[in-house]
């Protein structure tokens, strides 16, 4: 496929000021290990034959990444390729040749879902980060977040998604799913991900979030009782689990007497604060606030891709912080 620029594209590429989107895409161009990622998908990707020639795999992967960075539907992604030159150039496309339509973009997503390739990408990238010395193993921070799903029954099936469930948090009811994550305490990178319906108790998935090499586990008060769970009896770690808010409030009523206990709670809070970084990236940076698809499998695929990209975004943040400190 030709990468030759049209007049409009070449005019755009020579303009002086870079937009925030251009700067972001340029950073992602440099940080993503494209060869490692395409190697995961290549065995399953259609080969050129007698039929319609498929778009280059890396082009479709780049489009798929942009969908997640900018929270775009298949149709919105097709429109963006026509309307936004920086996104078209990032995908190595130009207006002088055919651009992938929404069906082609959707079929690529379905390919990843069918073979659970987003999960494989998550593992591949994390292995690459561990080999590079970025992902450590000393400690794991765990947390879970509720992801809302459409609760309306005004659809073709006239029912809510049967794989999503209702749960109460505080005084508010939520309908949807949960993303449970295990995060490297040193770097803030996500090493484990489990998706469930929203009514699943956080503690039930704790064992699936540990990699087995950590020396300590940090969590909020929702994980109280973890050391007593039968499935965690053999886990030999220091449990840094926050006390329940009521107990902390009682401690603060006599701060002089309980100074040490209060300081320990502050220490626990400062350690586990980093677990919020991945959620902040996918929600605020990438704009992911609601389950887009029906069923846990499709949404698990999207979340695995989001956390893969969030890890790489976090590495880019770390590199830029280091550069500023020099």
Curated annotation (Swiss-Prot):
Involved in the transposition of the insertion sequence IS5. Signal peptide: none annotated. InterPro entries: Transpos_IS5, Transposase_11, Transposase_InsH_N. It comes from the Bacteria. Keywords: DNA recombination, DNA-binding, Transposable element, Transposition. The keyword DNA-binding applies. GO terms for molecular function: DNA binding; transposase activity. Belongs to the transposase 11 family. One of its GO terms (cellular component) is cytosol. This is Transposase InsH for insertion sequence element IS5Y. One of its GO terms (biological process) is positive regulation of DNA-templated transcription. The keyword Transcription does not apply.
């Amino acid at each position: 496929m030709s990468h030759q620029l049209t007049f409009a594209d070449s005019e755009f590429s020579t303009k002086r000021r870079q937009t925030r989107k251009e700067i972001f895409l340029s950073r992602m161009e440099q940080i993503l290990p494209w060869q490692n990622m395409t190697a995961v998908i290549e065995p399953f990707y259609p080969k050129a034959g007698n039929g319609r020639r498929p778009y280059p795999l890396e082009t479709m992967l780049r489009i798929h990444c942009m969908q997640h960075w900018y929270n775009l539907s298949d149709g919105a992604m097709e429109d963006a390729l026509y309307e936004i030159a920086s996104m078209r150039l990032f995908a190595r496309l130009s207006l002088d040749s055919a651009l992938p339509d929404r069906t082609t973009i959707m079929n690529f997503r379905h390919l990843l879902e069918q073979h659970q390739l987003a999960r494989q990408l998550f593992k591949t990238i994390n292995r690459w980060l561990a080999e590079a010395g970025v992902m450590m193993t000393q400690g794991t921070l765990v947390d879970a977040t509720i992801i809302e799903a459409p609760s309306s029954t005004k659809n073709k099936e006239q029912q809510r998604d049967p794989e999503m469930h209702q749960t109460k948090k505080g005084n508010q009811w939520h309908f949807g799913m949960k993303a449970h994550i295990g995060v490297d305490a040193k770097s803030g990178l996500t090493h484990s991900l489990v998706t469930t319906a929203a009514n699943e108790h956080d503690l039930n998935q704790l064992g699936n979030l540990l990699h087995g090499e950590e020396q300590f586990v940090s969590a909020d008060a929702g994980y109280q009782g973890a050391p007593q769970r039968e499935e965690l009896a053999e886990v030999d770690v220091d449990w840094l689990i926050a006390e329940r808010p009521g107990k902390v409030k009682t401690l603060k009523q006599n701060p002089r007497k309980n100074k040490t206990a209060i300081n320990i709670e502050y220490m626990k809070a400062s350690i586990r604060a980093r677990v919020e970084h991945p959620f902040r990236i996918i929600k605020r940076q990438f704009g992911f606030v609601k389950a887009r698809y029906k069923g846990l499998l499709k949404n698990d695929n999207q979340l695995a891709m989001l956390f893969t990209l969030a890890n790489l975004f976090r590495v880019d943040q770390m590199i830029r912080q280091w550069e500023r400190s020099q």
